[in-house]
């Protein structure tokens, strides 16, 4: 798996901020495979969620994120690509992004995704604002890799300097869904995934 120098630089600069200023606490890192591909699916409360989600896994793991296509303007697109992200068109089924994610997962990469699709409205805590997207589960099923749930807390209160927390859980059981119609299997796998994410979030 190729390593991104830009990702390493961002991680080094972020380390004292997250662990010093925000006292980042992480548990369950052993649930995320180090060598094999996987899909890491997390709740989404802030644009800063990728920050505490990825740093506790570094340097053993560099996450590959889907970045909304609206961010792909020069020179920001160069930094995004250098950090290992790839574009996705939000609000529509992006076949190219899905195929890219499946290929990367099969190659041993950890694909980070947010099934809620967008950040939650302020004040929404437990209920998901909209029907969760099935893309994360679909990618895990098609790539035949583990589907790992995760949850972050505190990224919506950065100005208050509240402590950041992240938890990673054991892989969601989806082996019994493989071989079924992909669309139907993805819906069931997503339901299981969101239950696990809610449980992790409640434990933080």
Residue ranges, per PLM feature:
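N-terminal membrane-anchoring alpha-helices
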Residues: 1-25
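Non-catalytic C-terminal accessory region of glycerolipid acyltransferases
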Residues: 2-6, 96-204
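Catalytic core of membrane glycerolipid acyltransferases/transacylases, capturing the structured
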Residues: 10, 19, 33-92
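Short gly/ser/thr-rich secondary-structure transition/capping motifs
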Residues: 19-27, 95, 150
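Membrane-interface helix-loop junction between the first two transmembrane segments
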Residues: 25-35
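A secondary-structure boundary/capping signal
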Residues: 28, 67-68, 84, 114-116, ...
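Residues at the C-termini of beta-strands that transition into short coil/loop
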Residues: 30, 69, 89, 151, ...
């Amino acid at each position: 798996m190729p390593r991104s120098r830009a990702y390493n630089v961002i991680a080094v600069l972020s380390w004292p901020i997250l662990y010093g200023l925000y006292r980042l606490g992480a548990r369950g890192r052993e649930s995320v495979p180090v060598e094999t591909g996987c899909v890491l699916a997390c709740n989404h409360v802030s644009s800063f969620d990728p920050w505490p989600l990825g740093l506790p896994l570094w340097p053993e793991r560099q996450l590959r994120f889907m970045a909304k296509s609206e961010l792909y303007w020069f020179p920001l697109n160069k930094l995004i690509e250098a950090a290992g992200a790839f574009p996705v068109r939000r609000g529509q089924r992006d076949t190219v992004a899905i195929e890219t994610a499946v290929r990367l997962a099969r190659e041993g990469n950890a694909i980070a995704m947010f099934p809620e699709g967008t950040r939650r409205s302020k004040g929404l805590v437990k209920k998901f604002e909209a029907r969760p997207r099935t893309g994360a589960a679909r990618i895990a099923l098609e790539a035949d890799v583990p589907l790992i749930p995760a949850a972050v807390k505190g990224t919506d209160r950065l100005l208050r300097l509240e402590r950041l927390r992240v938890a990673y859980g054991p892989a969601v059981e989806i082996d019994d869904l493989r071989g079924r119609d992909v669309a139907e299997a993805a819906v069931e796998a997503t339901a299981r995934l969101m239950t696990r994410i809610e449980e992790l979030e409640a434990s933080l």
